[in-house]
């Protein structure tokens, strides 16, 4: 069955206009009325340490986890009913993400701007930078139907969510050693081709502690070479301020999600893997605000390339 019908049930005009009113979501335009690049304003965010703000933050976090627990329990039950139908479970997993992710972002209350949404329904390998737990909420809400994600194999041991992740046919990677990781990537690529799916990956391989962009792993390029799917970069800004790693405090920092046009991989060659990684990493460096750019180390530029 074709899984490329990617429009989300939450993207109807009425619901979308309601969401824009609630979150301040808009697509910037220039004087001619055409979409234009909106400068990131997350760096201008000023923290508020008043006690009422701290209390509200605790309430929001509690509401997020309670809400997620309820929807996760409900969808685990649905998945068990749909056990004989793998593709139906993939679609239900996406539906769970759309409902839960949108609800969690509403609870957090961050103003959100989405740009380039015309590229959000392509069957592709979606990649995005990872600096906060909020990134996961956004991805859950925004990914098109027929999309699976990749996580470490240990996710199955996360109570409720791990079981739902597996039941929804999301992919897992064994990172215990390089050979196991390579074989896992091959299995992911085969599953994506066989089931006609899209895929979303955090190419850094982990969450940044500081919000600054980390070097990219090569796994997403290997998958692109095996599937020949285009790569759609998604640049997330401001999420590192909205919910910092290892913090119990959320903040109403403005968030921007920007989709870039698909990068075709039809003619890519395996000998140029390092070049492709550097090229896409440089795209992120160019479009992230100063607070999220990687620090320049001696002998290397901001994109991680050698200056020599």
Curated annotation (Swiss-Prot):
It holds the Pfam family Acyltransferase. SUPFAM superfamilies: Glycerol-3-phosphate (1)-acyltransferase (SSF69593). It catalyses: a 1-acyl-sn-glycero-3-phosphate + an acyl-CoA = a 1,2-diacyl-sn-glycero-3-phosphate + CoA. One of its GO terms (biological process) is phosphatidic acid biosynthetic process. Its EC number is 2.3.1.51. The chain crosses the membrane at residues 65-85, 124-144, 148-168. The keyword Cell membrane does not apply. One of its GO terms (cellular component) is membrane. It is a multi-pass membrane protein. Its main location: membrane. Keywords: Acyltransferase, Lipid biosynthesis, Lipid metabolism, Membrane, Phospholipid biosynthesis, Phospholipid metabolism, Transferase, Transmembrane, Transmembrane helix. A motif (HXXXXD motif) lies at residues 130-135. One of its GO terms (molecular function) is 1-acylglycerol-3-phosphate O-acyltransferase activity. The keyword Metal-binding does not apply. It is found in: Membrane. The HXXXXD motif is essential for acyltransferase activity and may constitute the binding site for the phosphate moiety of the glycerol-3-phosphate. Converts lysophosphatidic acid (LPA) into phosphatidic acid by incorporating acyl moiety at the 2 position. This enzyme shows a preference for medium-chain-length fatty acyl-coenzyme a substrates. Belongs to the 1-acyl-sn-glycerol-3-phosphate acyltransferase family. This is 1-acyl-sn-glycerol-3-phosphate acyltransferase. It comes from Cocos nucifera (Coconut palm). The lineage of its organism: Eukaryota, Viridiplantae, Streptophyta, Embryophyta, Tracheophyta.
């Amino acid at each position: 069955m074709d899984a490329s019908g990617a429009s989300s049930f939450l993207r109807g005009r009425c619901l979308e206009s309601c969401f824009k009113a609630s979150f301040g979501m808009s697509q910037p335009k220039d004087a001619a009325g055409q979409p234009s690049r909106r400068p990131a304003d997350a760096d201008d965010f000023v923290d508020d340490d008043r006690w009422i703000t701290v209390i509200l933050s605790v309430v929001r976090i509690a509401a997020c986890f309670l809400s997620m627990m309820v929807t996760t329990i409900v969808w685990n039950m649905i998945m068990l009913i749909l056990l004989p139908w793998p593709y139906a479970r993939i679609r239900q997993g996406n539906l769970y993400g759309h409902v839960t992710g949108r609800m969690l972002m509403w609870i957090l209350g961050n103003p959100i701007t989405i740009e380039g949404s015309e590229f959000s329904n392509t069957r592709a390998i979606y990649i995005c930078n990872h600096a906060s737990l909020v990134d996961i909420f956004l991805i859950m809400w925004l990914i098109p139907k027929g999309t699976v994600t990749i996580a470490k194999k240990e996710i199955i041991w996360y109570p409720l969510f791990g079981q739902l992740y597996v039941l929804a046919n999301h992919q897992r990677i064994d990172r215990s050693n390089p050979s196991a990781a390579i074989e896992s990537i091959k299995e992911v690529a085969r599953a994506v081709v066989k089931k006609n799916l899209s895929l979303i990956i955090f190419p850094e391989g982990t969450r940044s502690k500081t919000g600054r962009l980390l070097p990219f792993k090569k796994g997403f390029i290997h998958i692109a070479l095996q599937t020949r799917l285009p790569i759609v970069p998604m640049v997330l800004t401001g999420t590192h301020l909205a919910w910092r790693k290892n913090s119990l405090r959320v903040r109403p920092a403005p968030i921007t999600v920007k989709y870039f046009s698909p990068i075709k991989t039809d003619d890519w060659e395996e000998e140029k893997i390092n070049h492709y990684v550097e090229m896409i990493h440089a795209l992120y460096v160019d479009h992230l605000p100063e607070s999220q750019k990687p620090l320049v180390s001696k002998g290397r530029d901001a994109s991680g390339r050698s200056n020599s």
